[in-house]
Amino acid sequence: MSEFNYYKQYIKPNSVAYDIGAHIGEISIQLKNFGADVYSFEPSPNNFPILKSNCESLGIKCFDVALHQSPYECFTRFKDCKTDYKEDGVTLDTVQYIKYVNLEDFIKENNIPLPNFIKLDIEGMESIVLKTFEFLFNGVRPIIYAEIHAQPKNMNNQNYPDNPHWVWPEDGGFDFNKLKDFNYSMLDPSTNTFIDKNFNYNPAEKTHQGFLLIPN
């Protein structure tokens, strides 16, 4: 089943959906079309103006912030799905000014309703950002479609101090086995089956696919 079918299955009229890593709004518009009130997060100054142009007239709220454990602002090479920039023949991501926020604090400060559904596609930063979702796992318990970008442990491409590609649990990243403690299950859309809770929930190296995190 495609990810769009899952969006259609789990989005109910007037539900609240967050599109985290919204790019230029393709998914945000789909979520809106399925009946959700949509809040889109896209920090890249290359993408955000296009996101606003595509989405704000539809009633989608757009925020030019990225998520992290603590708030700060910086210049960093940033993975914005435009990897055509090269230095000395090596493809790199361009340096951009990025504003990081803590999601729980940002929600409170901006009076944003809590989500029923989250689409999370942030090019490996999910391995950090999911650590900040405990208030959601224990609270409103949204369904989360998370795109996982787990690179090999000996690979360092697109891995920047302020925008890491992937952080493994032993290095301080999110331990997906913690989902069991929050009474969440993981569904693999490629097979439409749940991962056995006796198995390791952490992705294998070179994993790049979506998973559904579903409260029991």
Where are these regions (language model features)?
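Phosphate/nucleotide-binding beta-alpha loop and adjacent structural elements of enzyme active sites
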Residues: 1-216
